[in-house]
Each structure stands twice: as structure tokens, then as C-alpha cells.
Design a protein with these regions (language model features):
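Positively charged, low-complexity intrinsically disordered leader regions
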Residues: 1-31
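Phosphate/ribose-recognition catalytic cores of enzymes acting on nucleotide-derived substrates
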Residues: 3, 207-326
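Generic structural signal for residues in well-ordered beta-strands
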Residues: 10-12, 99, 160
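N-terminal catalytic cores of NTP/NDP-binding nucleotidyl/phosphoryl-transfer enzymes
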Residues: 20-82
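Residue-level signal for inorganic ion chemistry
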Residues: 38, 90, 130, 190, ...
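A structural preference for short, hydrophobic beta-strand core positions in alpha/beta folds
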Residues: 61, 101, 162-163
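N-terminal Rossmann-like or analogous alpha/beta NTP/dinucleotide-binding catalytic cores
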Residues: 68-156
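Glycine-rich, Lys/Arg-enriched anion-binding loops that position phosphate/diphosphate groups
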Residues: 153-253
Length: 326
């Protein structure tokens, strides 16, 4: 029996374009954590989709609900996306049929890799072909490697593709490298390695009212604590709200001129928008880092600088393509 109580020896039912098993279907499964779902992951996802279509079965991406280092090393790893965003990107960009998040806990950490393959991937999820990256490791003490997995799969009559590393500008594409770019404020280079504009999603919350009264009206969202924070400063951005996309100027930081806030805020002035955004979901796409956050002698000086920021953002965004994940 699997974890849901379904018999693993259920009878087979043949569908039009896929082989179904009562209780579960056969799948082509991509394995990995997929933080950022970047250009390296893209090669893996495209191969997964291609194989699934060829074999006439659903495609699946199997990942974890948290970064394994949270359990293995007991450290917090700032991520590029939330779990919901990872699912959305995988489905929208690569048309993967299903995305599952396995719970990574101490039981998972200590599970031998062979048992994980046999019990979870083959028996529970019906894997008939697996796709992994060249550096994929899993199972107790990371003893499972891509090469060991491929050998075991061959002995079970299951396919296993190993995707080689992907390089751009002589640099291996990796989540770690992209996190460093975002932390440094290099939004443009991060977009090259992600394959889309880095974004932050959140609900608009009330600010202190200073911007709307003395400066420019802004929509404020809290910086998600689980995600890597872009470098403090001002960015040319685009903001998605209620299905519409607006050019914007966004400040990330603590607003030192008008009194520092205890938490990091993401404040966006939407160009050409008027109305109340409180309670609405905003998605802020980062296009270009314009300048560092700085403390001005007074609000008048700050307002003059924001006007300059708006002009610079408009000049850059006028020739920029629309965001990819909307």
C-alpha cells in the first residue's frame, strides 16, 4: 500500500494517449529542488515534457516543500520563489502537467536513496522515465547520484536522462549564483540566467501615509522573509495588478529619509495609475537597478530625486519587453 492507502498493484487501464493505473498514472518525472526555475532547469523541464508527449503519459515535476539544508544543515536558505510561484512558473513556462511538493523532514533525510526510488518514484508515483540534472544528489547522506539513479533505473526497465550543466557567458547557471546577483542588485543579469524577470509577489498593505501626502503615492508590500532580498535601492520595475501591467519605480529598503522602518518594505509608484490598491495582490518585476537607497536632507530633496528616478525608469522601460510570468 502507498501512503494514500492505494494498492500499488492496481489493475492497468489504457487511455487514449496514456497508460493509466487505478489510483495513479504512469509519469515522466523531473527531479530537483528547482529554486528559481532558471535556464538550467529549463533544459530539464523541456526534456521532461518532450518525453511525456512521446510516451503518451503525464509529465510531473517532483520537488520539496523546503530547501533540504533547512533540515540537513539547520540553516535558512533565502529562496528565489515561494512554493506557489515555483508551481506557477513550472506550469506556465513549460506546460508540465503536475507539480508535487514532497515533505522534506528527518524521515526523508534518512531514507536510503534506493528505497526512495523504489517506494516513492516507481511504486507510488508510477515513474516510467526520470529526468535529473548532472549534479542531482538525494537520499541519506546524499549518497544517491544521477549516475547511480540511471544504473538502477536501467535494471528496472525505466528510462533516466541526465541533463548536462548549462552555461551562459562562461558561468554555470545555478540558483546560488542567481541569488548572489539579486542580492547585489543586478536585476538585468539575473533575468538572463532565470530566463524571465525576477519578481516578488505580495498583498498591498497600508504604509505610513507619508508618500501619498508629501511625495508620490506608493503601493507597499512586505518583503517575504523566506526570499532573498534584492539589494536596497531604487529599481525600474513593472507591476502586475488585477490583470494589468504598469510601468513603475520601486524602492526596496527602510526609507531612511522619512524615518527608518523596522522591516524591509517594497514600495512601488505605479505610473499612470490612480486608485486604492490596499488588499490587492501585486507582482513586482525587477528590470534595472537605478541607484542605491540613500538618506536625503529633507523631503523636498527626496521628491526631486524621485522625479529623476521616474524619468530614468521611463527611458529604460520604453524599450523593454513585457514581463514573462503574468
Amino acid at each position: 500500500m502507498n501512503r494514500k492507502g492505494l494498492s500499488l498493484k492496481s489493475r492497468v487501464r489504457s487511455g487514449k494517449n496514456r497508460t493509466e493505473v487505478v489510483g495513479y498514472m504512469h509519469h515522466v518525472i523531473a527531479l530537483g529542488f528547482f529554486d528559481g526555475v532558471h535556464m538550467g532547469h529549463a533544459a530539464l523541464m523541456k526534456r521532461t515534457r518532450q518525453l511525456a508527449e512521446h510516451l503518451g503519459v503525464p509529465s510531473m515535476a517532483l520537488t520539496f516543500d523546503r530547501h533540504p539544508d533547512e533540515i540537513v544543515k539547520e540553516i535558512q536558505v533565502p529562496l528565489l520563489n515561494t512554493t506557489d510561484e515555483r508551481r506557477e512558473i513550472i506550469k506556465k513556462r513549460f506546460a508540465i502537467d503536475e507539480v508535487r511538493f514532497a515533505v522534506f523532514d528527518r524521515e526523508m533525510m534518512t531514507t536510503p536513496w534506493e528505497r526512495y526510488v523504489e517506494d516513492t518514484l516507481i511504486s507510488e508515483l508510477g515513474a516510467i522515465h526520470l529526468v535529473v540534472g548532472h549534479d542531482h544528489r538525494f537520499g541519506y547522506m546524499g549518497e544517491g547520484t544521477a549516475e547511480k539513479l540511471q544504473k538502477l533505473c536501467k535494471s528496472r526497465g525505466i528510462g533516466c536522462d541526465i541533463i548536462p550543466k548549462v552555461e551562459l557567458n562562461g558561468v554555470t547557471v545555478s540558483s546560488t549564483y542567481i541569488r548572489s546577483l539579486i542580492a547585489e542588485g543586478d536585476a538585468e543579469r539575473a533575468a538572463q540566467y532565470l530566463g524571465y524577470r525576477h519578481f516578488i509577489t505580495g498583498e498591498a498593505i497600508p504604509g505610513r501615509g507619508i508618500g501619498s501626502k508629501a511625495l508620490y503615492a506608493t503601493a507597499n508590500i512586505a518583503m517575504p522573509k523566506a526570499l532573498v532580498s534584492p539589494a536596497f535601492g531604487v529599481y525600474a520595475t513593472r507591476v502586475l495588478v488585477d490583470g494589468a501591467v504598469y510601468d513603475a519605480v520601486t524602492n526596496i529598503g527602510r526609507n531612511p529619509t522619512v524615518g527608518e522602518t523596522p522591516s524591509v518594505s517594497v514600495e512601488s509608484h505605479l505610473l499612470g495609475f490612480s486608485g486604492d490598491l490596499y488588499g490587492k495582490t501585486l507582482r513586482v518585476f525587477f528590470y534595472k537597478y537605478l541607484r542605491k537607497e540613500q538618506k536625503f536632507p529633507n523631503v523636498t530633496a527626496l521628491k526631486a530625486q524621485i522625479a529623476e528616478d521616474i524619468k530614468n525608469a521611463q527611458a529604460f522601460l520604453s524599450a523593454a519587453p513585457p514581463p514573462e510570468i503574468v
